[in-house]
Curated annotation (Swiss-Prot):
One annotated Gene Ontology cellular component of this protein: cytoplasm
Cysteine disulfide partners in this protein: none
Provenance organism: Pseudomonas paraeruginosa (strain DSM 24068 / PA7) (Pseudomonas aeruginosa (strain PA7))
Subcellular location: Cytoplasm
Positions carrying O-(phosphoribosyl dephospho-coenzyme A)serine: 25
PTM summary: Covalently binds the prosthetic group of malonate decarboxylase.
Protein name stated in the entry: Malonate decarboxylase acyl carrier protein
Keyword Transmembrane listed: no
Lineage: Bacteria, Pseudomonadati, Pseudomonadota, Gammaproteobacteria, Pseudomonadales
Length: 99
């Protein structure tokens, strides 16, 4: 198990909390909570050691397209593919943007 942390610039705080996915399914879960301070912090707990560069590249692509909300994101990963990671992350961001 490896724990990775990342930080990106962000805009206004996320509107609410969100949960996407289920780590028990052999996939991953994304937990998102609003945060103050114009920063998006991400903590990844993964079963795949040495995967830091892959996560960094994936997050850089996702957050280059649009300004992320200020939030604290925790990801519990059990070897999900980059496509599934992006899907779950986008689901959590969308859910957190709703009232």
């Amino acid at each position: 198990m490896e724990t990775l942390t990342f930080e990106f610039p962000a805009g206004a705080p996320a509107r609410g909390r969100a949960l996407a996915g289920c780590v028990g399914s052999g996939d991953l879960e994304v937990l998102l909570e609003p945060a103050a301070g114009g920063a998006l912090s991400i903590e990844v707990v993964t079963s795949v050691n040495g995967s830091g560069p892959r996560w960094q590249q994936l997050f850089a692509r996702v957050f280059a397209a649009a300004t992320a909300p200020a939030a604290a994101i925790r990801i519990h990963d059990f070897g999900a593919t980059p496509g599934v990671v992006r899907l779950r992350l986008e689901q959590a961001l969308e859910e957190a943007g709703h009232d």
